[in-house]
């Protein structure tokens, strides 16, 4: 415990701020949760301690932004954040304490609820159904409270994105707390934080927790993250698509199904299998025979568990569903509300009334078979008496009138007035300035536009879309007339109209990207495809080792030290340390269960992902070309760009494999060649990166180095601000270039995978046993290459993000009159070379192609000098090969452009012409090709010299042992002794 916080460094000093830390009550992948209490009032809190080592600078900034929002969010069914205290090693979040644990534990231990004093009466009144889930009364109670929290988030333009039973925390019922006044007090964020606005006062109170953190906290690898909560993720998230707020509704459906049945609706060992099961079910949700549940509940569950977001029930219809707004059937007499309670609630001055008029909070009196009318305000006053004085001192009248106006409006509506119930939802576009922002101003991380002006235009478009959507939902005369027409229309016509409206809404959401969030770090197309290949049993899985002779790509050590050093950094975990989302949402009808690209696509989803990464980092969108036509020249022998200790010298293999004889071999060679070129560019970028992050690498950090926060304060004494800007710009463009080459490797692999899945049966019927073995070997080889590309892609993307943040920070520290200072690039202006993104501007002339050309020229000249003097011929060969690969990376696919144009399957779209920043003109192409030809000549010459020297050395070694044998024979054999015999 002593190392948990700087405030607890001394023995016995177990406190953070105004709170004393107790025993550990929970643990997650990135944080530990402790029991705590306030030093003055003794009220209980939950202290979540987040490790700072897992957060880089950007993530910390985003986390603090989320924390500031959470500190102002006040809703009875959302776990409140009291305070945040940062120590030297941790960020400690003081949250509301929920002593009954989470809903998953509640469901798991449902047979033992009668043994807990806080749930004993509930289990007696509403027993669970044998071999099933919870009682329907309890389910409806929890669902009402969850919908109340989601409605509040919806009105505040917030999306939870991680609704699951583990994030639904429970408190003892208000009646239990009223009777047991000696129980431990709980620190509340407001006077009515423990007063439910929906459900029954005799049942446990539900609170939604941990929303928003999933976006800003770093996740673990993709597989580990999906093992945490994939069973509740929407199919669009599992397909690695952009998703809107309707993803929460799918999660609500899975939680509802689990409460009914006692288990999730879909279970699988991995997310790929889970997605296939969801697709195979075809929206048919079956309930076990033992389940005793009403048809209304089944219908709502099926409406929520629609795999197509367009067909899924809308938020408006969900909030207006009879299960949500109607009274709960099957209540015992104690919990049946009085009819007049509805009228009292409508006229109540408290705007935090129950979410629906006919679902009041029951009196705190327990088990009286005759209920006396009790005023709603008196009930709330009785509940407030059990709150600690520290929370009672807080006043929130202004917050109640602003933040909960939508909920109060909804509380005054009846089920029959569904159309008028939407009048209070227009406030969603006008949240309080101190509560939540209208929309987060940060750009989507993987789809940042190349120009700030364009982003501002899109932001205005988003705002207009929100207004249009709210206008449709408001009680304008037009909408009222449409509602009346819908009420009078036949059911089939109404259904068609509703479906058409839903599709129109979805189209507008896509057009304006309203309410869309981008999956970061854990949902990546690159990792999805690699996971699918790794999980395929025909490829042997990730655990199948391959020898270097089979063509497996061996990851070389990351060069972090001096270029002449042989000390490499510890490579990043090959799982999924960094991920990027697909840039364009695809309709689910357009894709099968496979995550590979469609056969006819010239720019697969991986290319779109890398284009979004380029936009995010630089504002550069590279052409989406895919290598086709003849194979590149055979001379490529992959070598690391700089000396490393890992044998063999080659990145992939010796390069002595024969010319490809079939499609699989050609694909394997193309993938490896593109990966090898990317490795050369990556090595060049590492030279820049190691100057920005010069400390020794450590296994504690995923980047093979240290984080920005852990750098020594004296580093700026070594590098000037101008030098940091220059190095950051150069490293950034080189990393993006490496990403494009890696993406092209994935493009080739995805098309091959699609063709292979389509033609397996025919090929298996015609192929011989020998061909099958050869195909299996090549498939394993391609799978190994894909896994290496995925690992390198994640590593490069993360390092590029670090460099981008370093560049932005350095540019802010430049003199105000410096051309690269942000003040000299006001919003709406463009970078001269077009390479700009939000907050990132590159100096004119800084391009990856120019840097690579100059580097290749320098390396070849140095190698030529050494070749003339016969010094380090092996190093000369490495330099020549590296220079050739670097120049080929400059040309990218331009060396076989004429062949591609002759291909009928290749379509040179006009969009590439617009992105001409990544293209080079014809004169430059000829100059680069001429340089490649010259270096190849020198490479042939130096290899001839190496062979001659090797042959001479072998001949000398062969002759040397014979002379040694003759010399040793005379030394060892005894000389003849003259005979004296007669």
From Swiss-Prot:
Residues 335-359, 372-387 have a biased composition (Basic and acidic residues). Serine/threonine protein kinase involved in the cytoplasm to vacuole transport (Cvt) and found to be essential in autophagy, where it is required for the formation of autophagosomes. Involved in the clearance of protein aggregates which cannot be efficiently cleared by the proteasome. Required for selective autophagic degradation of the nucleus (nucleophagy) as well as for mitophagy which contributes to regulate mitochondrial quantity and quality by eliminating the mitochondria to a basal level to fulfill cellular energy requirements and preventing excess ROS production. Signal peptide: none annotated. It comes from Pyricularia oryzae (strain 70-15 / ATCC MYA-4617 / FGSC 8958). It is a peripheral membrane protein. This is Serine/threonine-protein kinase ATG1. Residues 388-398 have a biased composition (Low complexity). Uniformly detected in conidia, mycelia and appressoria (at protein level). One of its GO terms (biological process) is conidium germination.
